[in-house]
């Protein structure tokens, strides 16, 4: 049997080793395989090798890929294509199927890796880790030619099993090293007693590690320290709090903070924010509000509610007693103005008083009861007349002045002229009689024009006085809007803050402690602003009352002025006509012009200015004393009064006052006419009929005075005036030094005997006056004797003779 088997083996071997006489070419084989595939005999996929001389099935390719991976653990698809001699495309397809069928395999970046491969790699990594205590993932990735993310994915499931270490911040650490770092972090955290920035702590630990191990020491990332610290904090190993992940505040420090804040606040009932900032509390206001919900957070400090209670009690007493209080005087010194304002806003008694109009707050901290303010107002109202308020001329709007020009009330009667002038009345006669010479010379003609005196002209500026008053209501309608817009400004002009403050300090000196008025929001300034409308209302009421009372007084005042002006204007026009006679004698003409300006013009101007000044005051609601005292004004007084008059009237009045210092009476009359028209007064013109009547009355009165005159000195100017009237039919007023020139002018106008006696009388009178001036008090003096002798001659010889001549001529 064995021999037969051996024989069969030899025959098989011979058959196998024998060469066929017929061989198939490669082309034939390819065609044969295609025929078999077409007929379905070969029903599976055949793959060509890269050489093209061999066929391989997909299953066989998969098998060879598995065997290669099993042998190597990690294989690149490119390497498998070269090793197996199969196109890379087919290798990729079959590799994907292999990986899909075997979960222990993975295909990453063109490489197939098995779990066994990673187990082997991680074992090697663990060995290196134990040797070095730390390995960087970047180093592992570089050695394995893979990405760091893949290294992490491979290592994480094997940490604690194959790899004995901890992965943190891209580093692998051994447990012993982690424990050592944990101890360092724990010690550092517990050693810190003040708020500290954690990165700076980690930097210090890194420097310490480098000093311990040198340049070759293990490098530890700050994130590793932070991770360990977070774990310790979570476990409660270290106590404290972390803000923003980097600012560490130890519990011991927070505890010390709370104790310090509580101690300060409980002892002082307040605490400043700067105290908390020194304690390293970053948001002091929020901290205190959370710590003490009942406390009050102010701008600079945090206070206990008891501070409000204390101030509320003080404010309540102040309001109840009708006084004022500065909250800063009650509150502790550490509370400033803005904080005092907020505390006041929290006082119930003050808020209740404000709602019921019992108190008001001025400035940041001053509380005034309305009773106190009313007390000040009442005293100021009583003293309002001492404020020195005057009214803007023509506008009816008052303004304050520091000093007011004060002159006596009414000027003297316009009919009272210089008694030394020709035609002047005797000082010894009664007032009514004295007025007849110059003031009443118009006689019956004035009586006939009584109706005209009561009328006011309506043309041009003559209607100014009444039309202005009548149009005030219309102006109020059209200008009401503008007036309302300017009310505040007008109030300020009437009662300036400085004036009110000065008066307030006068009646309430205790308010001086509030300081000056530089601060526009200061308590004293605000109090003055509060009082201003009250004072304005009181002033307006008083002014309106005074206006209604003054209306009748104004009418009487202006009517009286008009009557006196009518009389004076007619007299001045009458006397002005005599000036034409002396135009050829400039020296005498100048004397007569100045004499009329002084004796007749000045009293008229004084009366007009004083009356218009008084009328302006009455028109604006100011009180004026009624006085008939005659006052002679100086040039400065006239200018001052004229400037106080309103608008264009002031200009005209100043021009009128200036003409008194001039040399022409006609210029004065023109200025007087302009002023009268501007003020609404009537300026009567002297017509022929009135002139004849006045000259007739003047002649009659002057004749009576010459007839009854017994004083030889006073007799001369009267008789000269009478002779001048007889010669030229003109009324004359001349000073004593112009009598000689007048007598010389009469030489050719009167009879020679009369002229001779008149000239003799004049020369004797001049000598008497000269001797009288030279005489001494000694009655035996020779000059006195000669004076008495010549005066006796005047009385006994010349005066009777001259009377006879003049009166005889007058009667004729």
UniProtKB/Swiss-Prot annotation:
Pfam families: E3_UFM1_ligase, UFL1, UFL1_C. Residues 403-415, 475-491 have a biased composition (Basic and acidic residues). InterPro entries: Ufl1, Ufl1-like_C, Ufl1_dom, Ufl1_N. GO terms for molecular function: UFM1 ligase activity; UFM1 transferase activity. Residues 389-495 are annotated as: Disordered. One of its GO terms (cellular component) is endoplasmic reticulum membrane. The keyword Ribonucleoprotein does not apply. Keywords: Transferase, Ubl conjugation pathway. Its EC number is 2.3.2.-. E3 UFM1-protein ligase that mediates ufmylation of target proteins. PANTHER family: E3 UFM1-PROTEIN LIGASE 1. This is E3 UFM1-protein ligase 1 homolog. It comes from Oryza sativa subsp. japonica.
């Amino acid at each position: 049997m064995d021999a037969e088997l051996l024989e069969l083996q030899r025959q098989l071997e011979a058959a196998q080793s024998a060469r066929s006489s017929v061989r198939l070419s490669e082309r034939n084989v390819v065609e044969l395989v295609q025929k078999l595939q077409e007929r379905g005999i070969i029903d599976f996929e055949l793959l060509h090798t890269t050489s093209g001389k061999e066929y391989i099935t997909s299953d066989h390719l998969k098998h060879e890929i598995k065997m290669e991976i099993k042998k190597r653990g990690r294989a690149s698809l490119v390497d498998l294509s070269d090793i197996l001699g199969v196109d890379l495309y087919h290798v990729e397809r079959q590799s994907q199927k292999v990986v899909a069928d075997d979960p222990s395999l993975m295909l990453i970046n063109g490489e197939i890796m098995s779990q066994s491969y990673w187990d082997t790699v991680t074992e090697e990594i663990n060995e290196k880790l134990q040797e070095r205590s730390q390995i960087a993932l970047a180093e592992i990735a570089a050695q394995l030619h893979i990405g760091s993310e893949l290294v992490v994915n491979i290592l994480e499931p094997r940490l604690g099993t194959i790899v004995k270490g901890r992965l943190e911040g891209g580093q692998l650490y051994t447990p012993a090293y982690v424990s050592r770092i944990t101890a360092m972090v724990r010690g550092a955290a517990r050693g810190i007693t003040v708020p500290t920035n954690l990165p700076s702590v980690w930097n210090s630990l890194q420097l310490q590690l480098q000093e311990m191990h040198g340049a070759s020491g293990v490098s530890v990332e700050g994130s590793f320290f932070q991770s360990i610290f977070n774990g310790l904090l979570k476990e409660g190993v270290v106590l404290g709090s972390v803000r923003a992940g980097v600012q560490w505040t130890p519990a011991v420090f927070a505890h010390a903070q709370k104790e310090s804040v509580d101690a300060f606040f409980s002892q002082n009932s307040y605490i400043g924010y700067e105290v908390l900032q020194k304690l390293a509390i970053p948001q002091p206001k929020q901290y205190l509000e959370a710590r003490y919900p009942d406390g009050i957070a102010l701008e600079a400090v945090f206070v206990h509610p008891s501070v409000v209670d204390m101030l509320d009690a003080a404010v309540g007493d102040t309001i109840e007693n009708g006084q004022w209080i500065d909250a800063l005087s009650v509150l502790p010194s550490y509370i400033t103005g803005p904080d005092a304002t907020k505390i006041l806003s929290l006082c119930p008694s003050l808020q209740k008083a404000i709602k019921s109009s019992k108190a008001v707050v001025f400035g940041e901290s001053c509380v005034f009861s309305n009773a106190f303010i009313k007390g000040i107002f009442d005293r100021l109202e009583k003293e309002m007349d001492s404020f020195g308020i005057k009214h803007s001329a023509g506008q009816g709007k008052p303004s304050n002045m520091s000093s007011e020009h004060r002159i006596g009330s009414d000027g003297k009667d316009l009919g009272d002229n210089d008694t030394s002038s020709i035609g002047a009345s005797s000082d010894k006669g009664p007032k009514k009689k004295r007025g007849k010479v110059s003031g009443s010379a118009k006689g019956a003609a004035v009586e006939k024009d009584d109706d005209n005196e009561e009328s006011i002209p309506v043309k041009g500026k003559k209607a100014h006085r009444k039309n202005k008053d009548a149009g005030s209501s219309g102006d109020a309608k059209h200008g009401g809007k503008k007036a309302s817009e300017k009310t505040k400004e007008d109030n300020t002009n009437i009662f300036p803050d400085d004036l009110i403050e000065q008066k307030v300090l006068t009646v309430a000196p205790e308010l001086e402690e509030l300081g000056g008025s530089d601060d526009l929001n200061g308590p004293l300034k605000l109090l003055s602003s509060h009082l201003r409308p009250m004072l304005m209302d009181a002033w307006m009421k008083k002014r309106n009352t005074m206006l209604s009372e003054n209306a009748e007084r104004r009418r009487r005042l202006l009517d009286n002025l008009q009557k006196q002006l009518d009389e004076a204007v007619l007299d001045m026009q009458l006397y002005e006509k005599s000036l034409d006679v002396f135009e050829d004698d400039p020296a005498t003409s100048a004397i007569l012009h100045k004499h009329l300006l002084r004796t007749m013009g000045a009293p008229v101007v004084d009366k007009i200015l004083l009356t218009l000044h008084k009328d302006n005051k009455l028109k604006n609601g100011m009180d004026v004393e009624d006085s008939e005292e005659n006052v002679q004004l100086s040039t400065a007084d006239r200018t001052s009064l004229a400037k106080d008059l309103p608008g264009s009237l002031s200009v005209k009045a100043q021009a009128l006052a200036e003409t008194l210092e001039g040399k022409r009476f006609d210029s004065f009359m023109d200025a007087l006419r302009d002023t009268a028209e501007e003020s609404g007064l009537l300026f009567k013109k002297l017509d022929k009929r009135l002139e004849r009547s006045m000259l007739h009355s003047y002649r009659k009165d002057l004749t009576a005075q010459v007839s009854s005159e017994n004083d030889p000195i006073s007799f001369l100017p009267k008789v000269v005036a009478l002779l001048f009237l007889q010669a030229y039919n003109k009324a004359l007023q001349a000073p004593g030094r112009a009598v000689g020139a007048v007598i010389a002018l009469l030489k050719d106008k009167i009879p020679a005997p009369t002229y001779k006696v008149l000239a003799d009388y004049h020369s004797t009178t001049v000598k008497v006056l000269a001797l009288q001036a030279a005489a001494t008090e000694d009655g035996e003096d020779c000059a006195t004797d000669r004076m008495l002798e010549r005066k006796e001659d005047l009385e006994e010889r010349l005066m009777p003779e001259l009377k006879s001549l003049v009166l005889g001529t007058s009667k004729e």
